[in-house]
Amino acid sequence: MTEETCWRAAENGHLECLKYAHQNGCPWNEWTCIYAAINGHLECLKYAHENGCPWGIRTCEYATKNGQLECLKYAYENGCPWDKNTCTDAAKRGHLECLKYAHENGCSWDELTCIYAARNDHIECVKYAHENGCPCHKKFISTIVQKILIPKWRDSVKSRQIIIYWMERSAQTSCAENGRARIEDMNSFENDCNSLIV
């Protein structure tokens, strides 16, 4: 038996097989916890952790890849480390509840959280991240709109929603920074976007 025996058992949620392998001297490594987390096999994750299986940043990161909120919670609440990739992967895959949980429990994030959420049409993740202080500077917003969203404009209602959301927020920021109000007609904005892709 090798380390693969344990992570294959965890990957498929075979708790009794995992227990048997471990109790009979089969080695395991961080991948046992990772595969349990990404596939939502909480009992396998608990057993592995409680019996000394190592875990690390990738355990939380991989839990968010498939929206495995309970595995993410268990890992974090039991001392598993995380980093900004946890938020990035949650946003990239549209797992809003994982993104909220990570952020509200102090997980860091950066511009990639907004960029990947927008690139993949996850408007709720874009809104949540932006409205909760995720850094997304104007140059990144411009890049998102010009290089990612406008080419998708015809094919995706969500892309339109994200562009409109960014433009509304950008207008609000400009008003606050310049001390004057300037409201753009969104129909005019939509016509401009449509003319760029015709």
Predicted regions located by residue number:
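Ankyrin repeat (ANK) tandem alpha-helical domains that serve as protein-protein interaction scaffolds
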Residues: 1-198
